[in-house]
Amino acid sequence: MKVLIFDTETTGLPDGKNPSIYDTQKWPHIIQLSYIIYDSETNDIVTLEDDYISIEDDVIIQPESQKVHNISRELLSSKGIPIEHALEKFNRFSDMSDVL
């Protein structure tokens, strides 16, 4: 069985305790999407991906979050890819997986 395990880093925390999922301005931006696909039958790692996501100049990375993940705007400028590309790639790998 192929298992996809993923993790994200963001620009901060949501604005407010329980903001609506439709109020996107209150949610942080994803700035890193990392995942592995593990084959439990062969005990092999099928793939290991680590994508930094580029963000617009007006998006603020909260200092508290940057202390946790150590992702700077400079790093995103040099290594970041558009979120659409990262999500398309993630979607392709999720199609290869039996479990998320």
Language model features with spans:
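Conserved non-catalytic scaffold segment of RNase H-like nuclease domains
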Residues: 2-100
